[in-house]
């Protein structure tokens, strides 16, 4: 059995490339390095809640669900959501911690996915299916990229 510590990570980077950058495997620091100038990052008011089964077994797929609420966006209404295993900004993908992403909410198998919200929509729920390839505890974190009325567009 693998015990998980699911933590809430509400403060994240709020700057990115206008129109998004597409789904991919990304470290969190990508927010400053590949989406824009790190000096324009700011704290998000979004609330992120990450959940999973209480007990997870080695080699058996499990689902992690992320609910993001209180979302503020720019005119493009694009948000980017991360599933991470570390808060250092590098080597923080689930694969870095020995987990395989079998699928994501957009039909791929990456830790960073983008969603375009409809007008008036200020929340979304997404999920990833993962499988642990090694025994031991793992902490998971969620992070978000988005723009807002007073910030750089994304």
What are these regions, as identified by a protein language model?
Residues 9-154:
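Sequence context surrounding c-type heme c attachment/ligation sites in exported
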Residues 2-10:
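Bacterial N-terminal signal peptides
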């Amino acid at each position: 059995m693998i015990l998980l510590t699911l933590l809430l990570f509400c403060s994240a980077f709020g700057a990115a490339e206008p129109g998004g950058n597409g789904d991919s495997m990304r470290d969190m620091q990508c927010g400053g390095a590949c989406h824009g100038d790190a000096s324009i990052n700011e704290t998000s008011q979004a609330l992120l809640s990450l959940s999973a089964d209480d007990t997870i077994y080695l080699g058996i797929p499990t689902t992690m669900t992320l609910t993001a609420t209180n979302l503020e966006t720019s005119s493009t209404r694009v948000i980017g959501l991360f599933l991470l295993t570390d808060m250092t900004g590098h080597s923080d993908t689930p694969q870095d911690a020995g987990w395989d992403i079998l699928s994501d909410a957009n039909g791929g198998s990456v830790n960073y996915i983008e969603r375009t919200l409809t007008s008036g929509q200020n929340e979304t729920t997404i999920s990833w299916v993962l499988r642990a390839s090694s025994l031991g505890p793992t902490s998971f974190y969620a992070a978000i990229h988005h723009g807002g009325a007073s910030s750089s567009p994304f």
